Amino acid sequence: MSDYDDLIPLEDAVDRTIACRNAFFDARPKTTASLDDLSGEILAEDVIAEVDQPSSDRATMDGYAFTAADEGPLEIVDERVFPESTPPTLESGQAIAIATGAPLPERADTVCKREDATIEDGHLMRPTLETGTYVYERGSNVTAGEQLYEAGERLSALDAILLRDLGRETVETYEPFSVGVLATGTEIHEGRHTDLDSPMLCSLLRSWGHEPTYEGSVPDEGRRVEDRIDELAKRHDVVVTTGGTSVGAKDYVLDALDALGEVRFHRVRVRPGKPIALARLPDHDALAVAIPGKPIGAYVIAALVARPLFTGDRPTATLERTITHDVGLGPEGFTYAIPVTFEGDDATPLGHVESPLAVYDETFDPSVLSSSTRAAAADGFVLTTAPLEAGARVDVIPTSGFE
């Protein structure tokens, strides 16, 4: 039996993570969020439009409103329609001055821009325009009864625009997770090694809309690891540990999770970062995510597998770039996350001997690279299951897409 036979594919791990999240969210308390503080909030209600938006046909340019089917010249009515106006009814053969954003009079269906208008003796020379030119039609943005958001969606600042247009000032959201972040490792606990993972993970968790607390460290002692996780699960919704997730003599986190709850998976076919674990801790109605200790591997696997637990979605936004060097891969059956830096349209594999960080020649070495803090300078990551050829176009997930 291969050492890798018990690993699960990336997509399977993400599916299990999201399923665990959905079950967990069913019992989450709810709160109210104002539109000026939406980023990262998780919506707890469906949002359905109550009225058409816009509520009437509106002009998108300053100019003259008229009916496209009328023959010219068109008599200009001695009025002007503003956004706050109640427009008059136009008779056949008439036009009216109108401001951007103003409602069109009844019968009017077209607007001629002011700078394109020809006026003679109080009449608008009939412009050659298609029906609907420079008109924002009623309901073209939102139709009454249309569902625009579904409970569980993660909101951003951009959503405030549409929600405000719908007349909302607040929305119902789920309370963010309280997250306890615990570093494991005797060398960290005794101050001999710097904890590189916890600040990064706390920053990620905040960018995902939740409330992390750094809870210190614990040495590589099985009972103490279990007791600390148990203690934190009483106070937090989610416990995130770093280090101790492999199967070495001093890796106790998985044993602790087994003793305290139900491990949903352990080890994913991703390099770097494969020894991640997700567990449910039913005695405390909490979840635990165990992240491997090497910093770049920790970042990659947290962004790919842990992120969906907190956001409900997957990082899918990519940029297309040209890879500058051949990159060979190790064992088959893995998704490799290859860090790259950008220069114009090119993506240089960070870690390749021709890059500023030279840790491998022809074959990608996730083990060494995962420990390299210089790899934190990456602009993005290429996810691939096949070797890369210099000159090929590749999809890159920018690091901003993980946040």
Q: Can you say where each PLM-predicted feature lies in the sequence?
A:
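Phosphate-interaction motifs
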Residues: 2-167
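Flexible, glycine/charged-enriched surface loops at secondary-structure junctions
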Residues: 25-35, 212-215, 243, 315-320, ...
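Solvent-exposed alpha-helices and their adjacent loops that cap or buttress functional pockets
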Residues: 57-59, 68-69, 87-91, 104-105, ...
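Structural motif
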Residues: 64, 73-75, 94-97, 109, ...
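Short acidic loop-to-helix transition motifs that present clustered carboxylates
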Residues: 82-83, 217-225, 270-275
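Phosphate-binding glycine-rich loops and their immediate beta-loop-alpha structural context
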Residues: 134-253
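Flexible glycine/proline-rich
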Residues: 256-403
